[in-house]
């Protein structure tokens, strides 16, 4: 591939009558995507009634954001990178995940790092550990905002709070798959009290990612 840039509009055309929008959290680097779907007006008894747009869970990633500048050499946007570093409980490993795949890979050529991260000595970096310590992480806040996407009207009392998410994780009733070496992940929560209550790969996440 000679051209490293991708025309974002090609992807956006797959979602007519809709727009990718964001809900900002308590910090500027917490921006949760959702898709606003426009509804046509309803004709009833010779009157036209406008219908409010519908907001749905959006998991399509940055490639459906018309404002996102895609460069395939840089990979996906690292949504969680700042959150992970701000917690100051991980460090860069000497091991690179590209050492065996591409021994001669030149990181500097692309301005990226292929070094893995690991927990610092005597540190636990799982979302369950944070939850049990009473810590509400950015991932938990992000997941809570996502859960309320369907209820974003001003007259609706949001029932899913970051604290509720934390408590569900601490109790073992829910998980947020969030490996520290996948900062590109847009956090979602899986549990019986949430929009996604089961997934075939949950067992794999529990074993290899948490």
Set out the residue ranges of the language-model regions:
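Non-catalytic terminal accessory/regulatory regions of metabolic enzymes
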Residues: 1-196, 205-206
């Amino acid at each position: 591939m000679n051209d490293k840039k991708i025309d974002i509009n090609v992807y956006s055309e797959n979602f007519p009558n809709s727009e990718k929008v964001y809900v900002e959290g308590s910090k500027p680097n917490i921006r949760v995507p959702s898709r606003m779907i426009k509804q046509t007006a309803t004709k009833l008894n010779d009157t036209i009634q406008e219908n409010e747009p519908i907001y749905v869970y959006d998991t399509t990633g940055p490639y459906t954001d018309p404002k996102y500048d895609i460069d395939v050499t840089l990979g996906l946007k690292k949504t969680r990178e700042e959150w992970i570093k701000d917690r100051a409980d991980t460090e860069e490993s000497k091991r690179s995940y590209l050492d065996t795949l591409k021994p001669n890979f030149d990181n500097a050529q692309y301005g990226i790092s292929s070094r893995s991260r690991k927990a610092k000595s005597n540190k636990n970096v799982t979302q369950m550990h944070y939850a049990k310590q009473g810590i509400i992480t950015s991932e938990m806040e992000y997941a809570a905002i996502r859960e309320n996407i369907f209820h974003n009207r001003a007259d609706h009392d949001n029932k899913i709070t970051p604290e509720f998410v934390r408590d569900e994780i601490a109790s073992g009733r829910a998980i947020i798959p969030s490996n520290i070496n996948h900062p590109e992940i847009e956090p979602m929560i899986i549990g019986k009290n949430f929009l996604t209550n089961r997934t075939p790969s949950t067992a794999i996440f529990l074993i290899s990612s948490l």
